[in-house]
Amino acid sequence: MAEFVPAETIEVVKKNCPEFYEAVANLQKEVFSGKKLDEKMQRLVLLAVVATLGDEKAVKRQTKKLMEMGATIEEIQDVMKVVYIGAGMPRFIKAVEAILEVAGDQC
């Protein structure tokens, strides 16, 4: 399971290894600049991936970002249906609980 990298760690890398930091930052920009899928759709795919992996922190981050981008609860629910089929009930429940922490009563 992917682990969340604390902001302090990122700042240390940025200060001590600026070239490496830039490469990673540029890669993230490149990843979300799809030619056929817009950033919101790519992040919906990423939400499915991190939910399937059971990474609750990443589910919360992606849900928050998606909501900021205007994703609807219905779109997020559609993703969770796919997660249920692909990952099973335990991972589905874990992801839904994380989403509820971010979205509250909107679900």
From Swiss-Prot:
**InterPro entries listed in its UniProt record:** AhpD-like (IPR029032), CMD-like (IPR003779)
Any single Pfam family the record assigns to this protein: CMD
Q: Which PANTHER family match?
A: ALKYL HYDROPEROXIDE REDUCTASE AHPD, BLR3452 PROTEIN
Protein name, entry field: Uncharacterized protein MJ1511
Entry's SUPFAM superfamilies?
A: AhpD-like
Where does this protein have coiled-coil stretches? none
What's the superkingdom here? Archaea
Select a single GO molecular function from the record's annotations and give it: oxidoreductase activity
